[in-house]
């Protein structure tokens, strides 16, 4: 790994008004927020700034990790995955639903591996960033599934790119 890599960890509330400022200058944004409204704000800011997004989420016994490059014409953004057909402000949060600590560890470790994959992008056999691929982790079964998300040409976040 490059010894010059740095991580800028943010413990700020992020919203549509400050997202662009908080992600400015990043090579990759890792989003671990706990609600759709914030995730969509982060995704939209990443698309606008041309920064890849690695999204990781946990709810109860399930998790998901996905790498999005909606700023590129051929790849989906996070909004392509979730769409706009729901009230992002009216969804449950981790605090309301609860999460299993072991799931957070599993998803966090998986996301760290995906972040390395994105940052190495082609520099090694490990470097396929897997843009638009969503990995679902199920702690009850336990098993994983993966599928690719297509870019939505009508997406409000990246469709015009």
Which sequence ranges carry the predicted segments?
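Adenine nucleotide-associated cytosolic modules
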Residues: 1-161
């Amino acid at each position: 790994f490059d010894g010059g890599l740095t991580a800028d960890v943010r413990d700020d509330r992020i919203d549509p008004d400050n997202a662009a400022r908080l992600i400015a200058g990043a090579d990759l944004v890792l989003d671990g927020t706990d609600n759709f409204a914030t995730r969509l704000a982060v995704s939209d800011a990443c698309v606008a700034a041309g920064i890849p997004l690695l999204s990781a989420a946990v709810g109860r016994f399930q998790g998901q990790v996905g790498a999005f490059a909606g700023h590129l014409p051929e790849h989906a953004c996070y909004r392509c995955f979730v769409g706009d057909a729901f009230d992002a402000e009216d969804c449950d949060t981790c605090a309301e639903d609860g999460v299993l600590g072991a799931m957070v560890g599993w998803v966090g470790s998986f996301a760290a591996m995906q972040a390395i994959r994105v940052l190495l992008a082609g520099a090694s056999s490990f470097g396929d960033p897997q843009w638009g691929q969503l990995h679902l982790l199920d702690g009850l079964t336990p098993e994983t599934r993966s599928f690719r998300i297509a870019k939505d040409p009508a997406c409000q976040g990246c469709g015009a790119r």
